[in-house]
Amino acid sequence: MISHILLDIEGTTCPVTFVTETLFPYAQLALKDFLERHKDDPSISQLINNAEDEWMQDQDKQSATLRHSSEEIQQPKHLKIESYLQLLIASDKKSTALKDIQGKVWKEGYTTGKITSELFEDAYEGLKKWHKQGFTLGIYSSGSVEAQRLLYKYTSKGDIENLFSHWFDTHIGNKKEQRSYTAIASSMACKPQNILFISDNSDECDAAKGAGLFTLYSLREGNPQQEPRDHPIIINLGDVDQWLK
C-alpha cells in the first residue's frame, strides 16, 4: 500500500518553461554580481571552493580547456569560478556545485519579490489533498534542497512548503541511479514498495522501479521527453488517485 509520494519538480508539479525561461536566465544574469557581493561570506566561500574542487575533477573537454586558460591569467577565484559555472549553465550540466550556488542566487530573487514560482493548477489541488489524506510527501530534484523549498514557499498562490516532509537533491545521489532511491527509502524510514515516485524522465523512473518503488510517468503536454517506456502514464496529477487505492 502506498503511504509516501515522492515527486520530481520540473514537468511534474511545475512547468518546464518556468525553469528554463525564468529560473535559469535569472541565475545566469545575477551570478557574477552575487558572487562579487558574497565572495567573503563563509558559506558562499565554501560553495566557491566546492565548485573549484568539482572543476578540478571535471574531465569534460570544454571544462578542461577553460581550466587551463584560467590558470594562465591573474584573476580572483570567484571570477574564475563564475566563468566555469556559466559554462555549466550553457551546457545544461547537472552539477551539484552549480545547483547549490543557484539556490542562493534564487533565494535573493524570491525574497526580494523578483521571482514567484508557478505550479500546475492540478499540483496545488493534488498536493493539498494528499497531505490532508495522510500521505507523506517528498521532493527529489536535481535542484538544491534550498531551491526546492523556495519554489514551494514563494508560489503565486502562497506558501505550500509545509505540505512536504522530505527533500532530496543530488547530494543523496544521481537521479538516474537505483541506489539513490534505495537511500531515499531508508531516509524516509519506509519500504520501497510503499513509495510512489512520479517523474517526467523515464531513466529516473527506471532507476526508481529498480529499487522497488512504484512509478508513474508524467506525460504532460510541453514536456521535452515523451517516452514513458513501460511505466504507467499520467497526464496530470489528477490522474494519480486511481493508483493510490
Curated annotation (Swiss-Prot):
The protein's annotated pathway: Amino-acid biosynthesis; L-methionine biosynthesis via salvage pathway; L-methionine from S-methyl-5-thio-alpha-D-ribose 1-phosphate: step 3/6; Amino-acid biosynthesis; L-methionine biosynthesis via salvage pathway; L-methionine from S-methyl-5-thio-alpha-D-ribose 1-phosphate: step 4/6
Enzyme class: hydrolase
Entry keyword annotation includes Transcription regulation: no
InterPro entries according to UniProt: Enolase-ppase_E1, HAD-like_sf, HAD-SF_hydro_IA, HAD_sf
Keyword check for Metal-binding: yes
Keywords (A to Z) from UniProt: Amino-acid biosynthesis, Hydrolase, Magnesium, Metal-binding, Methionine biosynthesis
Disulfide bonds: none
Cofactor(s) for this UniProt protein: Mg(2+)
GO MF entries: 2,3-diketo-5-methylthiopentyl-1-phosphate enolase activity; 2-hydroxy-3-keto-5-methylthiopentenyl-1-phosphate phosphatase activity; acireductone synthase activity; magnesium ion binding
GO biological process, one term: L-methionine salvage from methylthioadenosine
Catalytic activity line of the entry: 5-methylsulfanyl-2,3-dioxopentyl phosphate + H2O = 1,2-dihydroxy-5-(methylsulfanyl)pent-1-en-3-one + phosphate
CDD domains named among the record's database cross-references: HAD_EP
Free-text comment on the cofactor: Binds 1 Mg(2+) ion per subunit.
Catalytic activity, EC: 3.1.3.77
Subunit structure: Monomer.
HAMAP family: Salvage_MtnC
Function summary: Bifunctional enzyme that catalyzes the enolization of 2,3-diketo-5-methylthiopentyl-1-phosphate (DK-MTP-1-P) into the intermediate 2-hydroxy-3-keto-5-methylthiopentenyl-1-phosphate (HK-MTPenyl-1-P), which is then dephosphorylated to form the acireductone 1,2-dihydroxy-3-keto-5-methylthiopentene (DHK-MTPene).
Protein family according to the UniProt entry: Belongs to the HAD-like hydrolase superfamily. MasA/MtnC family.
Protein name listed in UniProt: Enolase-phosphatase E1
Lineage of the organism: Bacteria, Bacillati, Cyanobacteriota, Cyanophyceae, Synechococcales
Underlying gene: mtnC
